Curated annotation (Swiss-Prot):
Highest classification ranks of the organism: Eukaryota, Fungi, Dikarya, Ascomycota, Saccharomycotina
A Pfam family hit: ICL
Cell compartment(s), UniProt: Mitochondrion matrix
Listed name of the protein: Mitochondrial 2-methylisocitrate lyase ICL2
Induction per the UniProt record: Repressed by glucose and induced by ethanol and threonine.
Length: 575
């Protein structure tokens, strides 16, 4: 029994010890900063540490357009090691898994989860090493601050997915503590509940500072890695919907740099995946980046009234929407779209076009040393070939009401963008519209020809009708492993949790309406028992024994009447 005197003694001793610890900590922090002869010396010292960090194996293939000093100057006076983020530990775990699997040509494949239940079942699968959280799933099932669920248009509050990450990560930690306690008592090996989380950051939800805030949130909430796609804020769509608007290559590159810069300031090692939707994208927000010019489409008729002008005129005249829709189809039917080089091929002779291609290759390889030409440069080159021939090409006339350009989404566009993004990211994600192994193989080999260490990501999307693409059972089973051999190390079924949740509950509900508890027992309890699903004893699954153990410590063992997992009321002894 603890007396009041002992309490006072304990409190005096504890208070004194804590005071010494605080003062000691405060002095060490002041020494770390004030011990240097000046702020500049402190910055120089910390910058050297950052440079050494960047030289580690973790960042051997990462480029940065800024210096270590830029990072340190934006950290403040507290040394970076005063803040420790668990997500950075998880990121190192993820990095090592990726390195190992990329080296071996094996997949790091996983399923998207939508709640702690699914996370816990995923964790029990030894050969699934990571977890995934989808923005689509969050948008349609869990928008915490507004509860406005909707399709995946990226228009939910930007803390939506980070908050789901926090929810899943905290659940991982609870189940890890529960499993660790059990293993410490039984001497067994605990389940690894701390699978690194990879999360959907959409398009970053804004400009550079917004992207930095989003990246910071993900690191604080527990995500080991995130992916960012090259779509426009306000024009984002699910990668398997039409109408997505791409941003210029430079804009997305800025997002990747902003993300890395934020994590460098925090001193974390989280991973960023650069996703490109340019394989299927049909719209581009701006023509500002010359690297995109080769893929912008225009018309080859002269003196055509631009579609946007015709549209405004019709709207002013109150023409019905249905008539406007018909006119739009007619306008684009009459004005076929071409890239500049397709336009040249139409207007040049075969020999002229061949001469143009030879001159272009020579200019890019031998003189400019880059893989692209701007529209201005392509026009000048065309004039060199045929000085007297007028080349008609107008990429402004077909622009949409919002001002978007027509874009020729194709595998070549995806390759070009990916080669730009790769040095500033940890992985490259190719978003596709079909599960096509040959397309993936072609993409991989062209990327690896120039950047052999680039790890790739593949979305094994539920949006594909997998049964309609000619797979037999053998090919379907080997698809993941065949992709991994081509460097697609990370593979995920993004909405697996959502679909499995829907179909299992639909089967139960559909039967329950007529069969009552017979349906529940057959479709749930029997299946839980047959498959060794630990949700069957949901009280134990939720951590009731762990909490009882806490109570025993706090109450000095005098808790036999208040424990939740003993006594007649504890019904899980029936199983």
């Amino acid at each position: 029994m603890i007396t009041m005197i002992n309490n006072k003694t304990f409190n005096r001793k504890t208070t004194g010890t804590l005071k010494k610890l605080v003062l000691s900590s405060d002095k060490s922090l002041r020494r770390s900063f004030n011990g240097a002869s000046s702020t500049k010396d402190f910055v120089f010292s910390e910058s050297s540490k950052v440079e050494e960090w960047w030289e580690s194996a973790r960042f051997k293939n990462i480029s940065r357009p800024y210096s270590a000093t830029d990072v340190v100057k934006h950290r403040g006076s507290l040394p970076a090691n005063t803040s420790i983020y668990p997500s950075s530990y998880q990121a190192r775990k993820l990095f090592n898994l990726l390195e190992e699997n990329f080296k071996n040509g094996t997949p790091l494949h996983t399923l998207g989860v939508i709640d702690p239940v699914q996370m816990s079942q995923l964790a029990r699968c030894r050969n699934i090493k990571v977890a995934y959280i989808s923005g689509w799933a969050c948008s349609s099932t869990l928008v915490g601050s507004t509860n406005e669920v909707s399709p995946d248009f990226g228009d939910y509050p930007y803390d939506t997915v980070p908050n789901q990450v926090e929810r899943i990560f905290k659940a991982q930690q609870l189940h890890d503590r529960k499993a660790f306690l059990e293993a410490s008592i039984k001497g067994s090996t605990p389940v690894d509940y701390l699978k690194p989380i990879i999360a959907d950051a959409d398009m970053g939800h804004g400009g550079p500072t917004t992207v930095m805030k989003v990246a910071k949130l993900f690191a604080e909430k527990g995500a080991a890695g995130i992916h960012l796609e090259d779509q426009m804020v306000g024009g984002k769509r699910c990668g398997h919907l039409s109408g997505a608007v791409l941003v210029p290559t430079a804009t997305h590159l800025m997002r990747l740099i902003s993300t890395r810069f934020q994590w460098d300031i925090m001193g974390t090692e989280n991973l960023v995946i650069a996703r490109t939707d340019s394989c299927n994208g049909k719209l581009l927000s701006s023509s500002s980046d010359p690297r995109d010019h080769e893929f912008i489409r225009g018309i080859i008729r002269d003196n055509v009234v631009p579609w946007s002008e015709k549209l405004i005129e019709m709207e002013d005249k109150k023409i019905p929407n249905s008539a406007i829709a018909d006119m739009e189809k007619e306008w684009y039917h009459e004005n076929e779209l071409f890239t500049f080089e397709e336009a040249l091929e139409k207007q040049f002779t075969a020999s002229e076009f061949e001469s143009y291609k030879e001159k272009k290759e020579d200019l890019m390889v031998n003189k400019l040393g880059r893989a692209y030409l701007s529209l201005r440069e392509m026009k000048l080159l065309a004039q060199e070939v045929t000085p007297l021939k007028k080349i008609i090409f107008d990429w402004d006339a077909p622009r949409t009401k919002e001002g978007y350009y027509m874009f020729n989404g194709c595998i070549e566009a995806a390759i070009r963008r990916s080669l730009v993004f790769a040095p500033y990211s940890d992985m490259i994600w190719l978003e596709t519209k079909t599960p096509d192994l040959e397309q993936a193989r072609s993409f991989s080999r062209k990327i690896h020809k120039q950047l052999p260490a680039t790890k790739l990501v593949y979305n094994l999307s539920p949006s594909f009708n997998w049964s309609a693409h000619g797979f037999d059972d053998k090919a379907l089973k080997s698809f993941v492993w065949d992709l991994a051999k081509e460097g697609f190390t990370l593979q995920l079924v993004s909405l697996a949790g959502l679909h499995s949740d829907g179909v299992s509950f639909w089967e139960l509900a559909n039967s329950f309406q007529s069969d009552g508890m017979k349906a529940y027992v057959e479709k749930v309890q029997k299946r839980e028992k047959e498959t060794n699903c630990d949700i069957m004893t949901h009280q134990l699954w939720s951590g009731a024994e762990y909490v009882d153990s806490l109570m025993k410590v706090v109450q000095n063992g005098a808790s036999s009447q208040t424990l939740s997992t003993s006594g007649e009321s504890f019904t899980e002894t029936q199983f």
